[in-house]
């Protein structure tokens, strides 16, 4: 008996290691800590959200974080992937508040620890992204053509808004505008280690007043090249939404 106990004592660390490696499953959890922020600008529609990722039992290497937004009424989807990590701590440079960001990349979450993530996403719809690039390239050329040395900023914007290109692009963007008055579901997918995934579903809604204000971002985005020339900020509507777990209802 003493010999068996001694052998078990020697084997115990190895048994624990084998158990941890092959039998204990990783449990990954996403805990929201910031509101969902909705955007529309020259990059189109996208979101920003923040939280912490918790890994239980084993360390996990997060390979990707993706989001799919679904508009409930017509099931229109907005596919997004992580683009950058935005540090949510304001710093002051020359008296002006600034934030810092870095390109999104895989990271490791140690077992039993919490890893904060504040992610800005970008559309993965390459066809739509290419079209937006074409539109704003032509708008930039239009601005160069209409600018006059004695123009005020309002005169420049009014002249731009009166051009055929501007009106056609505005109508096109209004037609394809994603953020409408409706209910939405966000499917957050975290890919970790090799090909394992964990999904979370949240919901929010946009009311008629918010949708109308959001549509104003189209004209502001088309005219922001003029703002840049006159060095004035472009104030875009960016509503924030609480994380509400989607119960399927």
List the model feature ranges, each with a label:
Residues 156-168, 174-183, 187, 195-249:
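Acidic, serine/threonine- and proline-rich intrinsically disordered appendage/tail regions
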Residues 1-25:
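Membrane-embedded hydrophobic alpha-helical segments
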Residues 44-50, 183-185:
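Short, solvent-exposed loop/turn segments enriched in Ser/Thr/Gly
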Residues 17-43:
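Low-complexity, acidic Ser/Thr/Pro/Gly-rich terminal tails and inter-domain linkers that flank the onset
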Residues 59-68, 78-83:
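Short, hydrophobic/aromatic beta-strand segments
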């Amino acid at each position: 008996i003493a010999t068996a106990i001694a052998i078990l004592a020697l084997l115990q660390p190895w048994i624990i290691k084998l158990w941890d490696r092959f039998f204990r499953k990783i449990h990954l959890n996403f805990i929201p800590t910031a509101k969902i922020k909705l955007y529309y600008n020259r990059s189109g529609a996208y979101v920003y959200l923040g939280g912490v990722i918790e890994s239980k039992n084993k360390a996990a290497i997060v390979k990707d974080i993706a989001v799919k937004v679904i508009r409930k009424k017509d099931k229109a989807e907005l596919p997004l992937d992580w683009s950058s990590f935005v540090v949510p701590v304001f710093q002051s440079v020359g008296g002006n508040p600034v934030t810092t960001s870095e390109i999104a990349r895989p990271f490791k979450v140690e077992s039993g620890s919490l890893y904060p993530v504040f992610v800005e996403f970008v559309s993965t719809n390459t066809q739509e992204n290419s079209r937006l690039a074409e539109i704003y390239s032509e708008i930039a050329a239009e601005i160069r053509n209409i600018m006059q040395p004695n123009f005020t900023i309002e005169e420049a914007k009014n002249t731009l808004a009166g051009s055929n290109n501007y009106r056609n692009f505005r109508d096109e963007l209004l037609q394809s505008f994603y953020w409408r008055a409706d209910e939405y579901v966000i499917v957050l997918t975290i890919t970790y280690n090799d090909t394992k995934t964990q999904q979370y579903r949240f919901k929010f809604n946009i009311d008629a007043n918010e949708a109308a204000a959001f549509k104003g971002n189209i004209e502001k985005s088309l005219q922001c090249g003029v703002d840049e020339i006159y060095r004035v900020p472009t104030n875009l509507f960016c509503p924030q939404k609480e994380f509400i777990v989607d119960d399927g209802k």
